[in-house]
């Protein structure tokens, strides 16, 4: 009976010692958090292993993340994964659709993003671009003649329009001289003509008798204006003037209208500020609705695909520029010892318990062996 009690005792003591030893060893990985002293002498094994080696641990964790976890090959493989790409495209489509179907005004959205000043800047930039384009256009075209400056199609239209212009002018002239206003104007012109020629007026009066000069001249003027020869004459005159104009420099226009006036007139006609303001007062949905389907079905997938392709091709450079090892090292270095302990235990809690149990099991087995040895020795 004493023998079995001895074996049970040695087994129990072995299990307790083995389990406690392993438990103590695990605790000493983290505890104590700070060095302990007896007088001026530091107690051995203080602080614990992990608190003592925290900086080295931070460096090694950083290397481990970069060299074994977040590797360029692993990330590149993920970026080219078809299922991942489909999921990302779908997510992007949903998020973009939320934005472009927003009923808030563009002005309100810009205010939320703290870029409300964009209206003023956009107006100034558009006016600047228009001004620069007009000035560049004028600088170039001022070196040309009108024949060089105007497109061939414009030349043809003008030349084809000259006979019609002649007919229009003559038609309006006939209509004018047939009116009372035209007759009155013609009468004054005749009176002015004969005012300094008194004898000639008397001579004409002898021939015309009681009929006024204007009554005789008016039908003739109208008849002259209605003749085909007159139309051809006016057409020839306009054609000659057009030929002269084609040979003149566009720069001569500056004599009548300065560049600044041209620019100012165009800017006033365009009304940039008013146009920008109206545009910003529209809702995001109003602006994007005409191209919504194109954005969702084409632009977003293409953008995501090209972005992922670029990311896959440059992943190594991106990771190098991110300095992930340094980031991990800095973050771990900022952890308190308590937090670091909780972090490690949250991952290895079950395994550390099994190590404690294993120590107890081995201690118990050693106790049994000791009991058997005592039995044989007796």
Swiss-Prot record:
It holds the Pfam family DUF445. It is found in: Cell membrane. Keywords: Cell membrane, Membrane, Transmembrane, Transmembrane helix. GO terms for cellular component: plasma membrane. It is a multi-pass membrane protein. The chain crosses the membrane at residues 1-21, 357-377. Belongs to the UPF0754 family. This is UPF0754 membrane protein BA_0862/GBAA_0862/BAS0819.
């Amino acid at each position: 009976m004493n023998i079995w009690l001895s074996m049970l005792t040695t087994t129990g003591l072995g299990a307790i010692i083995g389990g406690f030893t392993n438990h103590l060893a695990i605790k000493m990985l983290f505890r104590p958090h700070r060095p302990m002293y007896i007088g001026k002498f530091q107690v051995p094994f203080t602080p614990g292993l992990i608190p003592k080696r925290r900086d080295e641990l931070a460096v090694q964790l950083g290397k481990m993340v970069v060299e074994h976890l977040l590797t360029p090959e692993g990330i590149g493989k993920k970026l080219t994964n078809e299922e991942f790409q489909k999921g990302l495209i779908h997510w992007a489509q949903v998020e973009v659709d939320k934005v472009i179907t927003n009923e808030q005004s563009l002005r309100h959205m810009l205010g939320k993003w703290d870029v409300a000043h964009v209206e003023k800047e956009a107006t100034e930039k558009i006016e600047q671009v228009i001004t620069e384009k007009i000035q560049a256009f004028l600088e170039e075209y001022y070196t040309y003649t009108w024949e060089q400056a105007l497109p061939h199609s414009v030349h043809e239209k003008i030349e084809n329009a000259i006979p019609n212009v002649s007919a229009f002018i003559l038609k309006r002239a006939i209509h004018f001289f047939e009116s009372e206003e035209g007759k009155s104007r013609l009468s004054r012109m005749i009176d002015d003509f004969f005012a300094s020629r008194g004898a000639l007026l008397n001579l004409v009066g002898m021939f015309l008798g009681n009929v006024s000069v204007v009554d005789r001249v008016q039908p003739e003027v109208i008849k002259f204006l209605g003749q085909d020869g007159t139309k051809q004459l006016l057409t020839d005159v306009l054609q000659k003037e057009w030929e002269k104009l084609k040979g003149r420099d566009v720069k001569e226009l500056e004599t009548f209208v300065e560049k600044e006036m041209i620019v100012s007139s165009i800017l006033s006609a365009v009304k940039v500020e008013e146009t920008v303001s109206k545009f910003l007062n529209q809702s995001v949905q109003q602006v994007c609705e005409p191209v919504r389907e194109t954005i969702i079905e084409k632009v977003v997938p293409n953008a995501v695909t090209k972005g992922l392709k670029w990311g896959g091709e440059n992943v190594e450079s991106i990771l190098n520029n991110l300095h992930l090892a340094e980031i991990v090292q800095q973050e771990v270095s900022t952890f308190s010892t308590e937090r670091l302990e909780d972090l490690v235990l949250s991952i290895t809690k079950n395994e550390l318990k099994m190590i404690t149990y294993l120590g107890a099991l081995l201690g118990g087995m050693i106790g049994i062996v000791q009991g058997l040895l005592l039995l044989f020795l007796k």
